[in-house]
């Protein structure tokens, strides 16, 4: 989210993203929850149960494949994060500027053994958590980890906002500049930029909530009938968006404080 926000001009893109989150992300999440709760089946079998005579259930297998692809993405990035935790703990980034940090990242990407090793570590941790079940494993551990995440992010926000030169990053992130959504010398280039921004905002709304790949059907199958699906979706969207906005308050002030291009990712 912060990377795409920096690429498309900061606060103006944030408003565009929030719009699609409300008009697309939230309704689609409620619908996916409804499919899961009504069928009480996995994402691969939910449509067969609800509409056995229709051919729309073929989509469920594509969604299942999408979940596998998404898992490949998250296990890879999760491996990067574990590697960075070790590097930070051993002082690998001490005294490095932006170019030096980029070299460390490039060296990690050039080392297949390191990448595969950390990815496998993430997979093992994930399997261990899932083996404990949804409520005793995923739910219980997620509550602890999310609390720790929010506490760490609050500390980082305070630190980032107190850096010299952080004011420029705050303005970039929180003050909309709609002209950046139409960047370009000609009218066609300007509308192309706006179209790309709209597409990115729409895609981010789906990506950040893991929509369209049947993942939410799985969680929906565990939601009791005494719970409001809309209420659950609103809380999830609110928490997800809050974390994304906090990440922006960490990254953009730090980027401007250290002279790093906020659109570099």
Roles of regions detected by a PLM:
Residues 16-51, 75, 214, 258:
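Juxtamembrane transmembrane-helix boundary signature
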Residues 3-8, 38, 43-62, 75-135, ...:
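Inter-helical loop and helix-membrane interface segments of multi-pass membrane transporters/permeases
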Residues 17-26, 63-89, 118-132, 147-160, ...:
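Hydrophobic core segments of alpha-helical transmembrane domains in multi-pass membrane transport
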Residues 1, 143-265:
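Membrane-embedded translocation segments of transport machinery
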Residues 11-17, 49, 57-61, 227-236:
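Membrane-interface alpha-helices at helix entry/exit sites of multi-pass transporters
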Residues 1-14, 19-23:
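N-terminal signal-anchor module of multipass membrane proteins
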Residues 118-137, 209-225:
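Transmembrane alpha-helical segments in integral membrane proteins
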């Amino acid at each position: 989210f912060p990377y795409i926000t920096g690429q498309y001009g900061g606060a103006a893109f944030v408003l565009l993203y929030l719009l699609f989150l409300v008009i697309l992300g939230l309704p689609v999440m409620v619908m996916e929850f409804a499919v899961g709760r009504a069928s009480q089946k996995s994402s691969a079998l939910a449509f067969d149960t609800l509409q056995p005579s229709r051919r729309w259930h073929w989509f469920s297998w594509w969604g299942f494949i999408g979940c596998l692809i998404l898992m490949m993405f998250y296990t890879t990035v999760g491996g990067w994060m574990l590697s960075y935790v070790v590097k930070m703990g051993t002082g690998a980034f001490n005294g490095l500027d932006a170019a030096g940090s980029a070299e460390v990242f490039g060296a990690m990407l050039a080392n297949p053994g390191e990448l595969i090793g950390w990815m496998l570590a993430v997979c093992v941790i994930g399997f261990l958590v899932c083996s404990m079940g949804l409520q005793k494993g995923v739910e219980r551990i997620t509550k602890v980890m999310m609390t720790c995440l929010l506490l760490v992010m609050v500390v980082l926000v305070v630190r980032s906002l107190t850096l010299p030169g952080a004011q420029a990053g705050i303005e970039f992130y929180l003050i909309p500049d709609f002209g950046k959504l139409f960047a370009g010398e000609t009218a066609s280039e300007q509308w192309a930029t706006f179209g790309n921004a709209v597409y990115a905002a729409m895609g981010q709304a789906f990506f950040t909530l893991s929509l369209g790949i049947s993942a939410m059907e799985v969680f929906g199958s565990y939601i009791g009938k005494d719970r409001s699906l809309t209420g659950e979706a609103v809380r999830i969207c609110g928490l997800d968006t809050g974390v994304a906005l906090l990440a922006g308050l960490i990254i953009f002030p730090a980027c401007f404080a250290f002279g790093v291009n906020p659109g570099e990712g």
